[in-house]
Regions:
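Hydrophobic cores of alpha-helical transmembrane segments in multi-pass integral membrane proteins
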Residues: 16-33, 44-64, 80-96, 130-145
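N-proximal short alpha-helices
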Residues: 2, 6, 15, 22-24, ...
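Calycin-type beta-barrel ligand-binding domains and close structural analogs
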Residues: 99-102, 106-109, 125-132
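Juxtamembrane membrane-water interface segments of multi-pass membrane proteins
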Residues: 1-15, 33-42, 59-80, 95-105, ...
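Individual transmembrane alpha-helices with interfacial aromatic-anchor signatures
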Residues: 115-136
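Membrane-interface interhelical loops and short amphipathic "cap" helices
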Residues: 32-48, 104-120
Length: 159
């Protein structure tokens, strides 16, 4: 790989790290808001989402920045896109603490006593969750694949 490509991968990996760190920070701050919402159970879900997905993104970035791998620039682009797509999903969950939608997260909504949101709110929840979910699966799959390639090149699955 050229120096420019490596720099691009490194820069994008740092951006992924920043997304993860900020997701955790927003999640921690959001925790103070949880008891003051109409649906605190849904607000708690948003808090957990911000923090847990933020940690996953931090882990992804740390792996990219600190371990040898075969992740190319396009794959890192997918990973960065996934990090960006987490924001609308997590923010929609935070908004859902007021909306009370039921279609995307029916178990949590049932526990929260939510009765359903406006049609556009239900659509926002669905679109943001599906987009982020698919992007995260693709990003993590590319990450695993790149590390498996490295292990296979070394002649063992243990790298």
């Amino acid at each position: 790989m050229s120096t420019n490509t490596l720099m691009s991968i490194h820069d994008r990996s740092r951006h992924i790290l920043i997304h993860g760190l900020m997701l955790v920070m927003v999640g921690l701050l959001w925790g103070f808001v949880v008891p003051h919402t109409p649906h605190p159970r849904l607000a708690l879900g948003a808090h957990i989402q911000f923090v847990s997905v933020g940690i996953v993104i931090v882990m992804m970035a740390v792996l990219l920045l600190k371990l040898p791998h075969h992740v190319g620039p396009k794959s890192v682009g997918v990973m960065l896109t996934a990090a960006w797509l987490i924001w609308p999903m997590a923010l929609s969950e935070a908004a859902n603490a007021w909306w009370g939608t039921t279609q995307m997260l029916p178990i949590a909504a049932g526990q929260a006593g939510a009765t359903g949101g406006a049609v556009w709110q239900e659509v926002v929840m669905k679109v943001t969750h599906v987009a982020a979910g698919l992007a995260l699966v693709a990003a993590w799959g590319l990450l695993v694949s790149a590390f498996l390639k490295k292990s296979a090149a070394a002649g063992t699955l243990n790298g």
